[in-house]
């Protein structure tokens, strides 16, 4: 047996009555045995860790004739108070986990294997103690055989940051990522379990609520058993079923159970992991009432809007029961999931808050025989029956139900929006003559269309006027010049496509004076990264430009620039049900821009700068094949995109001998800019998509130039637009020019 505790610093020892609080900085606790093994074993003790805490434990739950050795990371009882100011990392290795409890019953095995355990608080046979509390201000990472976070009688485990809790399904007993037996587990939901945070939370393992109403040390049932999980980020996920013995036995007077915040793309994959529950054998009047018959959730709080909803992946054939529901949630039924079978995978909602909704998503292929897409409304009606709204039978009309049913990879999606009265007398959802039926493009087509729009956005990002490209050419005092600049920004499309693009480009150029003209050329190279509604992509662009800028003696100026660009993009998009499409394509772009304006000087260096600009461009079409993760091929043909943008601007500025600052507003209009694409594949009808960029918007530009040496000046602009389909959240141009 080896057990060591490495303490970096003991900062203070505070004695208060019969108890002591020990403040400790960064700590690593190790306990490695061939039997019982506990890292931190705390009975009525106070510990305060001011830095990270790491606990590594290994042992054997079963060894010889010992079949319930306790192998646990942190074991706090009898009113212990544990405060961890930063993060906690617990690893429990147990190759032979306990198979039962002291009475040789598998339903007791969980008491003897935990990552973090808090319990036996309040009044016990050891006396009258305080509640047992473990509070982690930072994040918790737990990898344990058995139970990740276990709070028994009057025990509190509060993880105020994020969490990564991983358990390992066993065949000998049921295990849980979080378990409550008249205790409290709060993860990313504040001190009271009611304030969801914004940290990533990943829980791999079932959730359990145990009704200890038998044997020794029965719980007094003074309050409910509670677990509150804040899954509020796209990277957050719960995998596991939810056992609630109080609901299973129809005896839940305190309404204890799981409070699940499922928002912003977070996922709950509902499937029971590991061994099924076995019949309890001691002191219960009807043992069958304590078996797992489906996940039961006390409160499920979805997104505030449909755009911020979370996702339930329905896998287990047994029903999900939600006692109290609020917000918006998508429920996915994937191909091959038992829940997708006819009559399986029901979601029962007993009460819904006003304005809440659920959206069922699946495919005709996943639903198989009971989904006939040829008859309007039939497949939707069979699918929507998976929703049972018991509140409807009691007079509620609060739950909205939507259906999205994929009919293929590129084939249109079937949609249904039920009316508030589209439920039968038993509360089961039905399609009626009040239901709104429609079709829309598939999520794969929508994603591919967005990926194609990335090239158009790349072309837009490379447009510039004279000030953005060269700064204040008035400061150009010599015959020749070289310059370089950085272009970076963020733009997005949310109308008819969804693209969120970040780009970074570098441009270098050389020019020379020819009378009143500055004639030159430039090379550009840039990269971008794009996020789509369901997917992502990246791109590169390289281009050459020739330009001429003429300065008139009366302040007028004319700027002409012609450019050619080569663009390359790759992408992967997917739908909600796991089908993905990957491809790459190349385009060639050409553009011609003409800008004419006049700087009208006023007193004290102030000036007004009216201008007009016309930008003509063409992005070549492309025909290519993209492949799905199932091996099929989608042929995509994208037409060429012609664009004609006109801009009328007015600027005001102030110039000095060696500097210039200005503010400019320009009304812009896209006269063309329509992007058409066609998608085809074996076994499905050809479909089309259109992104129409014809639009009017306002460009706002702030910039200036500063000559810090006789032949060298810096220049830069900050640009943003308002009301555009291609929304420029920001663009920064920053350059340096040297004349000689």
Each model region followed by its residue ranges:
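Outer-membrane translocation/initiation segment of Type V secreted surface proteins
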Residues: 21-22, 327-345, 359-511, 587
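Extracellular beta-strand/beta-solenoid scaffold signature
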Residues: 28-43, 56-79, 95-124, 130-133, ...
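Outer-envelope beta-barrel architecture signal
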Residues: 199-201, 236, 478-482, 504, ...
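Extracellular beta-strand/loop-rich repeat segments of large surface/secreted proteins
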Residues: 200-204, 208-386
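Residue-level detector of the transmembrane beta-barrel scaffold of outer-membrane proteins
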Residues: 206, 241, 481-485, 518-522, ...
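Outer membrane beta-barrel translocator domains of Type V secretion systems
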Residues: 439-604, 718-719, 724, 735-737
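Solvent-exposed, glycine/polar-rich loop segments of beta-barrel outer-membrane systems
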Residues: 496-502, 533-535, 568-586, 620-642, ...
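Outer membrane beta-barrel transmembrane domains
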Residues: 545-550, 602, 635-740
